[in-house]
Amino acid sequence: MLWPIVTNQHYKDALKQAEDGGSPNNISPIIRYGLSGGASVMWMGDLETDFMEKIEDAITPEASDILFAPHHGRKSGRVPKDWLDKIDPTIIVVGEAPSSDLTYYDGWDTITQNSAGDIVFECSSGKTHVFVSNSTYSVDFLTKDDGVGDRHGCYYIGTFYT
């Protein structure tokens, strides 16, 4: 767990704001976990860009293979460039929100949940197979691994290697 740092004044202010009926977005945790020898994943909850910029020096995000974009991938939750460079994700998952509200992270490989539907990451040592529920969704940045078929109620779209 990278965030919250409960002694951080910005966190305390966001907690007070939520307690007073304001938005709870900026009390979201930043959680990172990884499979030994396999993929690492980072979730950033519903953090908003302006808040992330305030706490940018309080934490150092680690490199992660999969980043679930904060605030469902909305422009208002775009990850600061310095953090994004440190995380250096293989894939950024842009969540479900109106497409006009989303940031698509130009220059990074993304899977857009609005189009892909449900997403399954099957993580194993050295590789991660990716499946989605939309049978017509595809990306050009994953490698097809022979012998991997559809499963988990989803369609196989490719593999990345860690």
Label each PLM-derived region with a short phrase.
Residues 1-63, 117-127, 131-162:
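Core dinuclear metal-dependent hydrolase active-site scaffold
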Residues 49-127:
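Cap/insert and terminal regions of metallo-dependent hydrolase folds
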